[in-house]
């Protein structure tokens, strides 16, 4: 996974012709962060047939992006063809929101905006209005799974971030002796208002990753309780 470095990109090509020209601001549909300023509406852009992404032509339209680099991805397309995508993420929550075919953003002809990733309405005023992020998923049987990144040996138990990829939780206990798991379960029980018997902790995809499976709450309820508990 490439290291993500945050940048603010802008393209002054095809700037509006005067002070009365319309500008459209688009926000991340998940967290409400500002992502794109352009002089055309999203619904008027052509769509790719392969993934239904909106195609923004930088040669004819303004494209001011506020994103971070998400790395290069190779995708298999039909007839053995490979497609190269240089992905860009929302700065606020790191959700994949758009991509380009060329490595250099300034010389790229087109920006492809992921279908459904952006909104003309900012959700910043009320984060609870944002969609439930992918790290909190509804499972069969009424269960909800939460992807957690655990930081051990912290000063105290706390939730410090909720984004698309995971919920970051700090615990005071060291991870090596397994004490961190017990502290994590007890803390999450207090945050979610659940008993230990209503939660199961599973291994994730690396040493810091955990998967918490909970009962008797919906994904939306879990998300809202976690948001309320986040500390700066």
Curated annotation (Swiss-Prot):
Pfam families: DUF167 (PF02594). InterPro entries: DUF167, UPF0235, YggU-like_sf. GO terms for biological process: circadian regulation of translation; mRNA processing; photomorphogenesis; positive regulation of photomorphogenesis; RNA splicing. One of its GO terms (cellular component) is nucleus. The keyword Nucleotide-binding does not apply. Disruption phenotype: No visible phenotype. It is found in: Nucleus speckle. It comes from the Eukaryota. Keywords: mRNA processing, mRNA splicing, Nucleus, Spliceosome. The keyword Kinase does not apply. Belongs to the UPF0235 family. May play a role during early embryonic development. Probably involved in pre-mRNA splicing. Interacts with CTN. This is UPF0235 protein At5g63440.
């Amino acid at each position: 996974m490439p290291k993500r470095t945050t940048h603010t990109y802008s393209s002054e090509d095809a700037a509006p012709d005067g002070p009365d020209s319309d500008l459209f601001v688009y926000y991340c549909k998940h967290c409400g962060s500002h992502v794109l300023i352009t002089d055309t509406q999203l619904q008027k852009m052509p769509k790719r047939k392969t993934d239904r992404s909106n195609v923004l032509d930088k040669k004819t339209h303004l494209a001011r992006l506020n994103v971070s680099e998400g790395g290069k991805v190779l995708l298999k397309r039909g007839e053995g063809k490979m497609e190269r995508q240089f992905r860009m993420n929302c700065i606020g929550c790191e959700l994949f929101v758009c991509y380009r075919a060329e490595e250099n953003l300034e010389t790229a002809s087109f920006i492809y905006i992921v279908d459904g990733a952006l909104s003309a309405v900012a959700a910043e005023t009320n984060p609870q209005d944002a969609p439930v992020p992918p790290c909190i998923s509804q499972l069969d049987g009424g269960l909800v799974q939460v992807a957690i990144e655990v930081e051990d040996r912290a000063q105290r138990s706390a939730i410090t971030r909720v984004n698309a990829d995971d919920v970051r939780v700090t615990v005071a206990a060291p991870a090596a002796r397994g004490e961190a798991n017990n502290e994590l379960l007890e803390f999450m029980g207090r945050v979610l208002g659940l008993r230990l018997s209503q939660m199961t902790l599973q291994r994730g995809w690396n040493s810091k990753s955990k998967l918490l499976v909970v009962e008797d709450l919906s994904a939306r309820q879990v998300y809202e309780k976690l948001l309320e508990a986040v500390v700066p």
